[in-house]
């Protein structure tokens, strides 16, 4: 698995924590910023990561800002991307199993580092289940195509 990860300055410390976890799990990743003491407008980072995932250069993406909301909204502007804001273990699991979310977003001002690592593990260890959820994901894609 290959992960694209990015954040704004508010998410920098949490991103570093998640990078440590990716290394522990021997998961290949690329850090798309922001970098230490770098101020960025988060939509630019969300766009970079979402495009990398959309173009199949990376299997999944992780985006972190203050709340996770703006990153999710921006990533979902990219045709074909499903980004989910994750702040609890059930949502982390269902984002993958039910919705086949390509990108998880988190809020560094909303959750702490130990919860973030747990959510990352849950999200990484969950796969799309298909079944009844397949029709829902297919309809999401149809709506996305129709409204581009």
From Swiss-Prot:
Pathway: Carbohydrate degradation; pentose phosphate pathway; D-ribose 5-phosphate from D-ribulose 5-phosphate (non-oxidative stage): step 1/1. The keyword Isomerase applies. D-ribulose 5-phosphate binds at residues 8-9, 66-70, 99, 132, 136. The active site is at residue 65. Induction: Repressed by GolR. It catalyses: aldehydo-D-ribose 5-phosphate = D-ribulose 5-phosphate. Keywords: Carbohydrate metabolism, Isomerase. Its EC number is 5.3.1.6. InterPro entries: RpiB, RpiB_LacA_LacB, RpiB_LacA_LacB_sf, SPI_LacAB/RpiB. Pfam families: LacAB_rpiB. GO terms for molecular function: ribose-5-phosphate isomerase activity. Transmembrane segments: none annotated. GO terms for biological process: carbohydrate metabolic process; pentose-phosphate shunt. PANTHER family: RIBOSE 5-PHOSPHATE ISOMERASE, RIBOSE 5-PHOSPHATE ISOMERASE-RELATED. Catalyzes the interconversion of ribulose-5-P and ribose-5-P. Belongs to the LacAB/RpiB family. This is Ribose-5-P isomerase B. It comes from Listeria innocua serovar 6a (strain ATCC BAA-680 / CLIP 11262). The lineage of its organism: Bacteria, Bacillati, Bacillota, Bacilli, Bacillales.
